[in-house]
């Protein structure tokens, strides 16, 4: 039976904009199971990244519940969030956020304590085995982003969250990056949510949602 990895229930989030209270997320529900790759699209400022931050336990909702692997984590003390994020969630950001003084493979082996042979296997799967001993400054933008993708999949995390992973890449490299995410989601039976403006990569996901007026609507 396929396990539900993430469930967002009746999520609300508002911000104060001067004298006005602006509702960003309005009664949002979302469920993602293992092996599913979901995309969220919509204009800038519509709440996509806010929703991703709530799903990733980086931000608390004003109302609603976040369930991760069946547990209502929104009810847990905040000091437990860091441990859960580290163990259960992998992040892929717009900016790869690689440390310049660590080689590509060391971004996983040093920071995540991943065994060298496991790093080599993952890099081989992603077609970047040849750059494992290169520093980030020597890599192209596409190569740096692929290392960031490898880093997200190097742990036992069941949930992968990608925030505009193609933003700094050209069309071809952007599509390749998302193809790699898709491949690893299905191969490793992860659940993944990608926020993107790049509609050229939407054919690679299993489900698409559009954020409009604070609500999430299936496409």
Label the predicted regions.
Residues 72, 116-131:
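Conserved ABC ATPase "signature" region
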Residues 135-139, 143-145:
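Conserved ABC ATPase signature
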Residues 160-163:
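Catalytic Walker B motif of ABC-type/P-loop ATPase nucleotide-binding domains
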Residues 64-72:
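Conserved ABC transporter NBD signature motif
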């Amino acid at each position: 039976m396929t396990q539900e990895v993430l469930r967002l229930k009746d999520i609300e989030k508002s911000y104060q904009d001067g004298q006005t209270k602006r509702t960003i997320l309005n009664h949002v529900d979302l469920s993602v199971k293992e092996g599913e790759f979901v995309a969220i699209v919509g204009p800038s400022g519509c709440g996509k990244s806010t929703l991703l931050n709530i799903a990733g336990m980086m931000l608390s909702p004003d109302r609603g519940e976040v369930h991760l692997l069946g547990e209502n984590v929104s009810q847990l003390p905040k000091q437990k969030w860091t441990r859960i994020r580290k163990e259960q969630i992998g992040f892929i950001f717009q900016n790869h956020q690689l440390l310049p003084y660590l080689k590509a493979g060391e971004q996983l082996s040093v920071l995540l304590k991943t065994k060298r042979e496991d790093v080599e296997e993952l890099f081989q799967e992603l077609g970047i085995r040849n750059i494992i001993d290169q520093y980030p400054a020597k890599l192209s933008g596409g190569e740096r982003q692929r290392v960031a993708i490898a880093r997200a999949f190097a742990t036992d995390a069941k949930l992968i969250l990608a925030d505009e992973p193609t933003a700094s890449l050209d069309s071809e490299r952007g599509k390749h990056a998302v193809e790699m995410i898709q491949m690893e989601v299905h191969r490793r039976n992860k659940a993944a949510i990608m926020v993107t403006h790049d509609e050229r990569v939407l054919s690679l996901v299993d489900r698409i949602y559009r954020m409009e007026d604070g609500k999430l609507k299936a496409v």
